[in-house]
Amino acid sequence: MTEAMLTTDFPQLNLVHSGKVRDMYAIPGHDDKLLMVATDRISAYDVILSAIPGKGAILTQLSLFWFDLLADIVDNHMITADVTEYPEACAPYAEQLRGRSILVKRTKPLPIECIVRGYISGSFWKAYQQDTNVCGFQLPEGMQESDKFPEPIFTPSTKAELGDHDENISFERMQEIVGVEKAEQIARISKALYTRAADYARTKGVIIADTKFELGEVDGKIILIDEVLTPDSSRFWAADKYEPGKSQESFDKQYLRDYLSSLDWDKNPPAPPLPEEIIVKTKARYDEAVERITGK
């Protein structure tokens, strides 16, 4: 297995943000652009764990695929992923950047995580077991784990700092944060993106149970930013093995989450080391996601 990229170091560029997975660099002389670099770091429960070799390239490949497929719904921040077209300051790092980076427009990120759910799973399922009113949605009684909702639902959350937890908020609270008109626009865009992607993925044998979009503003216009519909930001299930009433076979981080849940770990840093077997099997799930969805 190839060596993983856990950290980045590009002295001629200016690191402006290091997230759970991505590092964002400003480029001297190009104030309207940023370089987004996907490392191989992997996180769960808002804790950075370790690295999955090649993961950053998988996330980048999928994001580029979805940016293209969804471009007629909303513009996105991508300028190019061809390292030969990057500004000159990036040239010394071309080999490190190839396949895992995107030159993007600098935007003002909206302070909302745009989550769309087509199926009941994960934390939403756990909350439903306690109360059928979840995130402001009154759901019918008697739903099973992994059941499909009649229509996709939009459940926003706050955007927490690294190490903190995102907090689910009501649509009304979101309206207070961004304004009524903008909130309606964000929800409409998010659901349209999910519906298009879910319909496409189903033709490839993949169910997108839920996903998280990030939106930003540039010149007063809302655009799609960050990563899009990857195994880090989504739940991907095998359509041919879908069976409501239980958790599903997936091509995402759920295998890793399940492993961590089996440990005596309080889900706070420091994270336990990941055995090689867990790293290899997680990588295999990510590989299958990109192969099924893109055909490559």
Curated annotation (Swiss-Prot):
Reaction(s) catalysed (UniProt annotation): 5-amino-1-(5-phospho-D-ribosyl)imidazole-4-carboxylate + L-aspartate + ATP = (2S)-2-[5-amino-1-(5-phospho-beta-D-ribosyl)imidazole-4-carboxamido]succinate + ADP + phosphate + 2 H(+)
Any Pfam family: SAICAR_synt
GO biological process terms on file: 'de novo' IMP biosynthetic process
Pathway(s) served: Purine metabolism; IMP biosynthesis via de novo pathway; 5-amino-1-(5-phospho-D-ribosyl)imidazole-4-carboxamide from 5-amino-1-(5-phospho-D-ribosyl)imidazole-4-carboxylate: step 1/2
UniProt cross-references to Gene3D superfamilies, sorted A to Z: ATP-grasp fold, B domain, Phosphorylase Kinase, domain 1
EC id: 6.3.2.6
Keyword list, A-Z: ATP-binding, Ligase, Nucleotide-binding, Purine biosynthesis
Assigned GO CC terms: cytoplasm
Family per record: Belongs to the SAICAR synthetase family.
Protein name: Phosphoribosylaminoimidazole-succinocarboxamide synthase
Protein species of origin: Desulfotalea psychrophila (strain LSv54 / DSM 12343)
Gene (UniProt): purC
